């Protein structure tokens, strides 16, 4: 498995742990449709949150949150709409789009299996990062 894939999986698992610590309930991971993918879907009360998770190592251009482009946002929104069509029990929920980002200030070796939790990283959780508008 490539280090980038390992980092992505670690970031999604760590983000889900963080969300659960904040009393969110897991609904789905890596929900796919023809239109795209949503990394995590969680709920709390009558809120349904679609979460994009990004992680970047030092040496990559830009910060992780900058990688959630307008095009990516549109794909996430379309995928969320498909999820709501497929699971109508969630249609009355208030929907929110969050982004959780992990930025590693150090370079990460590309050929070695890593325990990313041992690295220092900056965490940014942006609630309501984008909307349907």
From Swiss-Prot:
* Record-linked InterPro entries: Restrct_endonuc-II-like (IPR011335), tRNA_endonuc-like_dom_sf (IPR011856), UPF0102_YraN-like (IPR003509)
Q: What would be an example GO MF term here? A: nucleic acid binding
> Which residues does UniProt assign to the signal peptide?
none
Q: Which Gene3D superfamilies match?
A: 3.40.1350.10
UniProt lists the family membership as follows: Belongs to the UPF0102 family.
Put simply, this protein is called UPF0102 protein A1S_1049
Higher taxonomy: Bacteria, Pseudomonadati, Pseudomonadota, Gammaproteobacteria, Moraxellales
């Amino acid at each position: 498995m490539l280090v980038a894939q390992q980092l992505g999986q670690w970031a999604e698992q760590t983000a889900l742990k963080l969300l659960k610590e904040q009393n969110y309930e897991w609904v789905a991971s890596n929900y796919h449709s023809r239109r795209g993918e949503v990394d995590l879907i969680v709920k709390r009360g009558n809120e349904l949150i679609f979460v994009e998770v990004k992680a970047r190592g030092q040496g990559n251009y830009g910060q992780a949150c900058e990688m959630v482009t307008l095009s990516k946002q549109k794909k996430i929104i379309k995928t969320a709409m498909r999820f709501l069509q497929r699971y109508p029990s969630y249609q009355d929920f208030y929907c929110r789009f969050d982004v959780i980002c992990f930025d590693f200030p150090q370079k990460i070796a590309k050929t070695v299996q890593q325990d990313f939790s041992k690295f220092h990283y900056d965490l940014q959780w942006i609630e309501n990062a984008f909307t349907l508008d």
